[in-house]
């Protein structure tokens, strides 16, 4: 079997991907609602534990192939999240 697993392909990616951090939330219900709002608007979003405050969960939108892709959609992303500014982060699965 010469078909590589998806994990091995992802591990071999040699270019950067980017995500847009829209916030960190303490309520699991809020995290679910925010992720659903992005999904309803055609943007993939996911959650991960907040690194500096273990009681919070960070919501990230993406991944995007470039920072410019995020900047192009930033006004819409901010509106969906109800924020004025998020953070563009280099993402490595």
Predicted segments — roles?
Residues 23:
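Conserved beta3-strand ATP-binding lysine motif
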Residues 2-16, 26-93:
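Extracytoplasmic
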């Amino acid at each position: 079997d010469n078909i590589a697993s998806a994990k091995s392909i992802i591990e071999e990616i040699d270019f950067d991907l980017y995500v847009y951090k829209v916030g960190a939330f303490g309520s699991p219900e809020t995290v679910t609602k925010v992720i659903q709002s992005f999904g309803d608007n055609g943007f993939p979003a996911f959650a991960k534990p907040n690194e500096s405050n273990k009681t919070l969960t960070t919501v990230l939108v993406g991944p995007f192939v470039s920072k410019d892709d995020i900047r192009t959609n930033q006004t819409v992303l901010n509106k969906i999240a109800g924020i004025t500014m998020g953070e563009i982060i280099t993402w490595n699965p």
